[in-house]
Structure formats: C-alpha cells, structure tokens
C-alpha cells in the first residue's frame, strides 16, 4: 500500500429518507419533484420542446453512443442513468465568452476555472414510474488515473485545460472552437470519473452553466425558498433574511452556491440545491409557465445559450417518458462519506469517501442490488448444492482497481472453487460486473453469484455447464479476499467530522410552501 492510500475507518451508514416534505402547488403535481423540473428546463423536455420551441440545444461530442446501454429508447438494465452537471463556466454552450454584464450577473468573480460544483446522478426507469437523484459533494476526493488524487469538481477543468493546450500546439486558434473541443474533453474525463466512483454506466449527460441557471430562474419569474436563519456570506454573495422569500436569478445562484458559514459545508449546500429544485418545479408546473408564450420563449433562449447534452440523446422520446413520472416517486440522496473535514495530499480540505461503500450505496439506492438472504432462508438445500470440484472458474478484471480479479479469485478459492484463470478483460467489452454461464439458471453460476453478493448471470452458449466466467467491473461491491487492492481506492486522510446524521428529505409539489433549510 502506497503512502497516498491510507486505511479508513468504517463508513457512517447513509441517512434514511425522512417523511416527505410537501411543496406548494396544485395536487396534480404532488409527486413531480426537482429532478423533473431541472431536466424539463435544461434539456427542453416537456412543453416547449414538444411543440418545437427549442431546436438549438448544444450537443457535446461525447463517446456515449447515444447512451451506451440504450436501445430503442429503453435502457438495457431497465433504467437510464443521467449525469447532470452545473459548470462554473464563464462561456456559453457555444464556447463564446460571456459579456461583462452577464459576468456581473453571476457574482462569481473573473477567474475562469470551469469547476463542476454541482454533480448529480439521476436514474429514470424505462416505465417512468420513479426516479432517484444522488448528489456528489464537490470536494469528494478521488483518484484519477491521469491526474492522481484530486477533488472531483476539478476533473472537468483538468482534462479541459490539457486538451486545450494540445489543440493550441496543433495550431488551433479559433477561440470558440478551442473552447468547445476542450470542454468536450473535460466532460469525457468527468463522465469516466463519476463512473469509476459510482460503479454505474453513464447513459446520458446534461450540463448547464452559471449563466443558464440565472436565465432559467428569471424566465420562470423567480423561485421561492425558505431559510432557518438570516445569512450574510460575501464569498457567494448570499445576503438574505430568515424565512420565506422569492429569489431572482442572481440571488438564487448565490443561494445555491453558498457553502461557507453553513454547519455542514457542502452537504448543507446540497440540501439547498435540492430544496431549490423542488420549489422550481412548483413554479414551473403550477403557475402556467409551460402555457405562457413569453416565458416559453425566455426558457428557450436560456436553454439555447447555456445547456449542453450528449450527442444522440433522443430528447423527444425522453420527454414522453418524463410525463409518466407525474404519478411516481422521486427521491433525493447524497453519497455516503467517511468525513467532511479530511485532508488531501497538499493539505487541502476534502470530503473523503470509500469507493467500495459508494458502489454498494448506488447498488442499493438505484435498485441494482438484492438484499442478502437471512440465515436459513436460502432456497437451495444442501443436497442441491453443486459439486465445487466440477466448476472451472475464470475471473476477469474489467475495472481500474488493480488486483481486483486476484482478490475475487482468492475469495472463491477459500470457498472451495477451482480457479482456472485470472486476468484482465478486453478493454471496452464489459461495463458492468456479471457472471457468464451456459444458462441463466445454472446452479453452479447461482452459487457463485450468491457468494459474490448477487452478481447478475448472463447466458453464454459458447460455455459448457462446468465453466463459469466472473467479470468484475467498476461497479463491483461484493466480497474479496485480502489479496485484492480495493481498499487502496480510498485516498486522503479522513478527519473527525462525518457530518450530522441529518436525514435526506423527499420533496413533492404539494403542501403549503418550501421547506426551510440552513
């Protein structure tokens, strides 16, 4: 174990969801929450896209293939995973530098850094019945293969700057083209980092800049929020009294960007963002915004100026899918952390995490993991158990975690299995952990799946009944022996503060007003 990878204490369990907090609005929209409004506005979904109001949304040239796991509009794993990003950018979606007047609206200073201070993974099932939105703190400390240990909000900028330098060396001089191509590299780097951290495959990408946030908020006439206490924090420009109030675009941006002088820092800022988005949906869906031509025009202009989505995303069909979410359930959550006052390699303050625990959290939160059976509940009796000596197991590593296949193989050997081979999977062939067997209901494969935490079994007709291939990708969160290197995926030195166990609320569009927050 190298010095930069230090042991970490047991992670604090992720907070349970508290009782749903009602938001003001017409009852028909009671279960339509922040997620819907953000995607509706950012990717021109319901309403104005459906009637052709927006046709100029920028598309990033991202290697998502129109959604890696999307076929005929449906995700192969049953749900679409979207990476939603708020970029601290001083240029628009077309790469043009913002005007002095527009920069003044942002209250964010003149320094160009392209940090991604809002990172959220959103899962929408194919039937549109529910959705889960998981926030990733901006200071989450990760290991990147190209740039080492760093905060996740700096990944975008690191890859963007490197690509920009390469393009300039190649003779590119057009500023707009430079900016656009460099940003695409930043997006690719962030997509890979989020996939490694969460263990999921990103199907689609949506990004909005600071200007877009201001313009979208102003387009709907402002958003109502509520504060527990008055705040005056000059770094973000947040200067608001306690209680309920309606904020315009610039003030709303300060409201969701403040993290200093808050009890839990970035974690409280995430709560603000989630509460703001819940109020936004009420403003959009209960005030006739989508039937107001003037507001639709303003929304269309805001989207065109500041929103980027991945190339190949069929927005029209996705908008139709979102309409079914009105009667469903949307939940907000935040990834579990090991501390909020950790220390990075250069002494900087960071949020520390354990990748294994984050993978497990996403499997449970996004409905990908089956709960472990209770003692005595296993349906397979002793006389039905397969003869371990007959099983030939191959273990392939399709992740970035060095030694993962060896750790899994050692775990299976301890259980009595014969390991025929360990090695690396062909690059790009597998994105999710799985077990390959002759048949999906193979008793031998089922036994190995149970031993490894419930990995899905995929039938492969080229295999005989005694051969099983275990593929461990970035989402693997099952057991391993100590021979693996999964524990080395924790970086930074955890601090003493794991944050107060404040429950994550579920928001809906009903009730008497916005939830008051710190």
From Swiss-Prot:
Membrane-topology descriptor: Single-pass membrane protein
Gene3D superfamilies in alphabetical order: 3.30.70.2390, LCP protein (3.40.630.190)
Region (Disordered) location: 485-518
Disruption phenotype: Essential, it cannot be deleted. Conditional silencing of the gene results in severe growth defects and drastic morphological changes. The lcpA-silencing strain contains significantly less mycolic acids and a reduced amount of arabinogalactan.
The UniProt record lists the keyword Transmembrane: yes
Subcellular location: Cell inner membrane
Function per UniProt: Involved in cell wall biosynthesis. May be responsible for the transfer of arabinogalactan onto peptidoglycan. In vitro, has pyrophosphatase activity.
Protein name: Cell wall biosynthesis protein LcpA
Source species: Corynebacterium glutamicum (strain ATCC 13032 / DSM 20300 / JCM 1318 / BCRC 11384 / CCUG 27702 / LMG 3730 / NBRC 12168 / NCIMB 10025 / NRRL B-2784 / 534)
Gene: lcpA
């Amino acid at each position: 174990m190298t010095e930069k990878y230090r042991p970490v204490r047991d992670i604090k369990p992720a907070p349970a969801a508290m009782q749903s907090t009602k938001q003001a609005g017409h009852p028909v929209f009671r279960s339509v929450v922040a997620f819907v409004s953000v995607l509706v506005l950012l990717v021109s979904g319901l309403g104005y896209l459906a009637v052709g109001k927006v046709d100029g949304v920028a598309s990033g040239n991202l290697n998502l293939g129109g959604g890696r796991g999307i076929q005929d509009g449906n995700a192969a794993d049953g749900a679409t995973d979207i990476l939603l990003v708020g970029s601290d950018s001083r240029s628009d979606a077309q790469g043009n530098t913002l005007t002095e007047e527009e920069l003044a609206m942002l209250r964010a200073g003149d320094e160009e850094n392209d940090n991604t201070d809002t990172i959220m993974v959103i899962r929408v099932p194919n039937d549109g019945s529910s959705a889960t939105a998981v926030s990733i703190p901006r200071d989450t400390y990760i290991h990147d293969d190209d740039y080492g240990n760093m905060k996740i909000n700096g990944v975008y900028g690191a890859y963007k700057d490197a690509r920009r330098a390469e393009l300039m060396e190649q003779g590119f001089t057009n500023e707009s083209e430079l900016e656009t191509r460099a940003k695409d590299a930043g997006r690719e780097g962030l997509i890979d980092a989020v996939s490694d951290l969460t263990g999921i495959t990103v199907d689609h990408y949506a990004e909005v800049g600071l200007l877009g946030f201001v313009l979208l908020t102003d387009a709907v006439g402002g958003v109502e929020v509520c504060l527990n206490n008055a705040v005056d924090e000059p770094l973000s420009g947040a200067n608001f009294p306690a209680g309920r109030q309606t904020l315009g675009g610039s003030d709303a941006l300060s409201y969701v960007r403040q993290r200093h002088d808050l009890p839990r820092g970035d974690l409280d800022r995430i709560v603000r963002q989630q509460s703001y988005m819940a109020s936004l949906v009420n403003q959009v869906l209960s005030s006739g915004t989508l039937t107001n031509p003037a507001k639709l025009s303003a929304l269309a202009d805001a989207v065109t100026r500041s929103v980027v989505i991945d190339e190949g995303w069929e927005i029209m069909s996705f908008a139709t899918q979102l309409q079914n979410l009105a009667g469903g359930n949307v939940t907000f959550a935040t990834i579990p952390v090991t501390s909020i006052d950790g220390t990075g390699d250069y002494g900087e303050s960071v949020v520390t995490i354990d990748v294994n625990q984050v993978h497990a959290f996403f499997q449970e939160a996004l409905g990908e993991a089956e709960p472990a059976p209770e003692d005595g509940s296993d349906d397979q009796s002793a006389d039905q158990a397969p003869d371990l000596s007959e099983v030939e197991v191959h273990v392939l590593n399709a992740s970035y975690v060095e030694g993962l296949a060896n750790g899994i193989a050692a775990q299976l050997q301890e259980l009595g299995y014969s390991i025929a081979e360990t090695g690396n999977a062909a690059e790009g062939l597998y994105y999710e952990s799985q077990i390959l067997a002759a048949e999906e209901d193979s008793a031998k494969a089922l036994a190995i799946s149970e031993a490894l935490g419930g990995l899905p079994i995929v039938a492969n007709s080229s295999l005989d009944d005694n051969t099983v291939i275990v593929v461990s990708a970035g989402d693997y969160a099952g057991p391993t022996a100590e021979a693996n290197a999964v524990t080395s995926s924790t970086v930074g030195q955890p601090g003493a503060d794991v944050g107060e166990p404040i429950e994550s609320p579920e928001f809906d569009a009903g009730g008497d007003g916005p939830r008051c927050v710190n």
